[in-house]
Amino acid sequence: MVDASIIIGIHGLANKPPPDEKPTWWRQALIEGLRRNCGKTTDLLSFDFLYWADLRYPAPVSDNDNTQPYWSDQGVDPFPAYRSHKWTEIINVAEKIIGTELDFVELHTGISRINDYVLERELTDLGAYYDDDGFRTTVRKRLRDKLLEHRDRRIMLIGHSMGSIIAYDVLRMLGREEPQFRVDHFITIGSPLGLPHVKFKISQENDLVRTPSIVGRWTNFADRRDIVAVDAKLSDDYEPNDQGIKVNDVPVINAYRSPANKKPPNSPNYHKSYGYLRTPELSELVRAFA
């Protein structure tokens, strides 16, 4: 019997572990979040995954080269929630400063210095996505086919980092090509969708920079310390769709740290997908959906 609901993930920028390993780790991170944050012990999570790193890299990341793999945290308490975190006030102030700079520079020059740094230094795959027609067409088709494969089910689509851009673009395409198709919940984590250059690219293909028409709900999760999600408030940038669906921005604490047996040990990564996937705020949505 096929489950009525399914969660579909799409990974972000840079090379990844093998295609049979990466989705397993995403699924385990979601399940760990349910167990730690919601007290729900289950392995029965209907999950599918769109892997695209092979389109950019000749071989996946090996175990020896992967310094920040998924690993199950040894604690038993819930992961830290944003509302109770000791750094909340400091992070809020930092967000206001960064957001003000982004908006001011974009308003008066059309570009952002922070945006340029992120695109040039951190998001080389994104440059290829916009410059390489073959890559862009192929990765979009992969996700489009994956979504349509599950068209008779309730779908939660989770896009991390650059994967959130690919997901957004495909959802806008499907809105034009398959207007009856539905994605119940679109979730973006560590997303660069707020960058001015990304919004400009969206505006070149679409009438408005807005919520995709086929989406019933859109939630954006961002750790304020995540440089890729430097503009964390997408609700300021994306108009609602015709049904009035607007993106809901939810700040979170990405508590991921690298394992003790990797160098550097116990190193934080505020952009890491596994940290986002086991935040209490995301776990609550997964629990209610699944």
What is each residue range found by the language model?
Residues 84-108:
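Contiguous, non-catalytic segments that form substrate-binding/exosite surfaces or channel walls
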